From Swiss-Prot:
GO terms for biological process: farnesyl diphosphate metabolic process; lipid biosynthetic process. NADP(+) binds at R48, R73, R215, K315, R317. Its EC number is 1.3.1.96. GO terms for cellular component: endoplasmic reticulum membrane. This is Botryococcus squalene synthase.
Length: 465
């Protein structure tokens, strides 16, 4: 639940939080089918953010993407379970795709909600078998290639080169981007050129995966019974003898320099991946792709030059997440937000990290991102569709007006305030009107939020941008 102190410290995030809570509530659909009920319930447990993101998709794409996501999380659970010996894990990864059509197959492994996912995996299979043959084949092929790629890296104690690091991220995330693009095109909601530009979707996936690898350093290095080491020696070897050395506060300077090097490496995928945005046409698909990219860049901005990565968890506040989520509703809003985040990263580079050995290369990538965003914002397509800013939205203006009126009505009813102005209290009648106004204000606030959550611009999955 959102912490009250955080909300009070950031009042501008209150409305986005309420909107996000409303969307989360809507995402908890009641499905009579046991398989669908399990899949969407499990999706809520393993990734609340993706559960909301998936609701942006057109109806015909939600089930395939939901099932695809859970299948890959199950595959990832096998890879991440360090209690499984390699002689068991490797064959499981290489043959995982063969069990997609087996209604009886399940496995005991993982932790937390993933134990339930693996033990009740036949319910996922039930839904998978209802998908179109085309979607089934895309998912099966992607799972086969990913499982074999994961298996190739299991026998290695560490990732040695940046090229190996790129390959691993391609297997576990880049392939997903390409497969999802194929599902979008096969649905008829996107054009063939989205699949033709396979490297763009691959880079979007690699960017998000590298963001997770960077953020999860401490969790991975402390994994029992053996650490998971995805940072490539080619990078960290320049700053330490062992990857685990970065946990020692005495090595903070070297650790942060290595961290900045890793962030810089991830940014090169961000530059390339941006080129996929102009190809997306369906507004629901667009939002489902844009929101994770924004969250990824914000996470990198928080991690950059931040020693907290080696001490604990670095993540966005719930309110900030909600604010970013609700601010992305079309290409223009995406580029505006992305440019702002790139500007924040540039400021960190030129300020607190100005002496970093990699800062020139970091800035080169940041400037590339800024250039792409500015070019897109000045394009004829987006200028023609620029519309009003969020603060000019009638619903927002009404919301602010209600808030101001309610506040001053309340303040004026306070004895001290009335006394200063020589106004006599009207007793219970005024108290009653005050309560009525408060109730009406809250009701109108909820109506405004509900209306905004149903605006075609934000939720129409079938309209075209």
């Amino acid at each position: 639940m959102v912490k009250l102190v955080e909300v009070l410290q950031h009042p501008d995030e209150i409305v986005p939080i309420l909107q996000m809570l409303h969307k989360t509530y809507r995402a908890k659909r009641s499905y009579k089918d046991p398989g669908l009920a399990f899949c969407y319930g499990m999706l809520q447990r393993v990734s609340r953010s993706f559960s909301v993101v998936i609701q942006q998709l057109p109806d015909e794409l939600r089930h395939p993407i939901c099932v695809f996501y859970l299948i890959l999380r199950a595959l990832d659970t096998v890879e991440d379970d360090m209690n499984l010996p390699n002689e068991v894990k490797i064959p499981l990864l290489r043959t995982f795709h063969e069990h997609l059509f087996d209604r009886s197959w399940k496995l005991k492994c993982g932790y937390g909600p993933y134990v339930d996912l693996m033990e009740n995996y036949p319910l996922v299979t039930d839904v998978f078998l209802t998908l179109s043959p085309g979607a089934q084949e895309v998912i099966r092929d992607s799972t086969r290639r990913m499982g074999n790629g994961m298996a190739d890296f299991i026998g290695k104690d560490e990732v040695h080169s940046v090229a190996e690091y790129d390959l691993y991220c391609h297997y576990v995330a880049g392939l997903v981007g390409s497969a999802v693009a194929k599902i979008f095109v096969d649905s008829g909601l996107e054009k063939e050129n989205l699949v033709a530009e396979v490297d763009l979707a691959n880079n979007m996936g690699q960017f998000l995966q590298k963001t997770n690898v960077i953020r999860d350093y401490l969790e991975d290095i402390n994994e029992e019974p053996a650490p998971r080491m995805f940072w490539p020696r080619e990078i960290w070897g320049k700053y330490a003898q062992e990857l685990a050395d970065f946990k020692d506060p005495a090595n903070e300077k070297a650790a942060v320099q290595c961290l900045n090097h890793m962030v810089t490496d991830a940014l090169r995928h961000c530059e390339i991946g941006l080129n996929v945005i102009p190809l997306l046409q369906n507004i629901g698909i667009l939002r489902s792709c844009l929101i994770p990219e924004v969250m990824g860049l914000r996470t990198l901005t928080l991690c950059y030059n931040n020693p907290q990565v080696f001490r604990g968890v670095v993540k966005m506040r719930r309110g900030e997440t909600a604010k970013l989520f609700m601010s992305i509703y079309d290409k223009r809003s995406f580029y505006q937000t992305y440019l702002r985040l790139a500007n924040e990263l540039e400021a960190k580079c030129k300020g607190e990290a100005s002496g970093d050995p990699m800062v020139a290369t970091t800035l080169k990538h940041v400037h590339g991102i800024q250039k792409s965003c500015k070019a897109a914002l000045s394009s004829k397509e987006l200028l023609a569709k620029s519309g009003s800013a969020l603060t000019d939205d009638p619903a927002i203006r009404l919301l602010l007006l209600v808030g101001v009126v309610a506040y001053f009505a309340y303040a004026f009813n306070l004895g001290d305030v009335r006394g200063e102005h020589g106004v006599r209290a009207l007793g219970s009648i005024l108290d009653l009107s005050q309560k009525g106004l408060a109730v009406a204000s809250v009701a109108l606030l909820l109506l405004v939020l509900l209306a905004r959550s149903r605006l075609p611009l934000l939720t129409s999955a079938s309209s075209k941008q």
